[in-house]
């Protein structure tokens, strides 16, 4: 077992260990295909893709576990709470980009404040759209036939 775990890049001062999980070709391929690391995407499209996925799944906990879960308004309150969290997250992303990066020219657009602003804008648009899409599916009871866990 000791032969499988080595310092990352054979440098013990990096602070990371190279294990069979984090250095395998499958893991590296998977991480390179995530939208945040995928080459050729603008920050707006990266944010849009990330936002759609997050907006779609973020409505569920508010809908099923929120304080109005046993009322007729549970789905609507879940949508409103999800949109509120999405707005707060987008504002936090914009603030992070402003305080972390400057507006100097960089080959990677995500390493600039303007790139992070575009990422946050795409995230906001995609997440609200994803939450709205999930709301439409749940409101029309389209998921109840395929997933019995939602019928409670």
UniProtKB/Swiss-Prot annotation:
One of its GO terms (biological process) is photosynthesis. It is found in: Plastid, Chloroplast thylakoid membrane. It is a multi-pass membrane protein. Residues 1-72, 145-152 are stromal. GO terms for cellular component: chloroplast thylakoid membrane; photosystem I reaction center. It comes from the Eukaryota. Residues 94-123 are lumenal. Keywords: Chloroplast, Membrane, Photosynthesis, Photosystem I, Plastid, Thylakoid, Transmembrane, Transmembrane helix. The chain crosses the membrane at residues 73-93, 124-144. The keyword ATP-binding does not apply. Belongs to the PsaL family. This is Photosystem I reaction center subunit XI.
């Amino acid at each position: 077992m000791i032969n499988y775990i080595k310092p990352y890049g054979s440098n013990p001062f990096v602070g990371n260990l190279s294990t069979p999980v984090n250095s395998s070709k499958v893991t590296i391929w998977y991480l390179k295909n995530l939208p945040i690391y995928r080459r050729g995407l603008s920050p707006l499209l990266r944010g849009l893709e990330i936002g759609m996925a997050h907006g779609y799944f973020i409505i569920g906990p508010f809908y099923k576990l929120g304080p109005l879960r046993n009322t007729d308004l549970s789905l609507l309150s879940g949508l409103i709470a999800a949109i509120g969290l999405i707005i707060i997250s987008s504002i936090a992303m914009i603030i992070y980009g402003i305080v972390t990066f400057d507006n100097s020219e960089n080959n990677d657009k995500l390493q600039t404040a303007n790139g992070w602003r575009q990422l946050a804008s795409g995230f906001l648009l995609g997440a609200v759209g994803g939450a709205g899409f999930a709301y439409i599916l749940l409101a029309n009871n389209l998921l109840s036939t395929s997933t019995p866990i939602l019928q409670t």
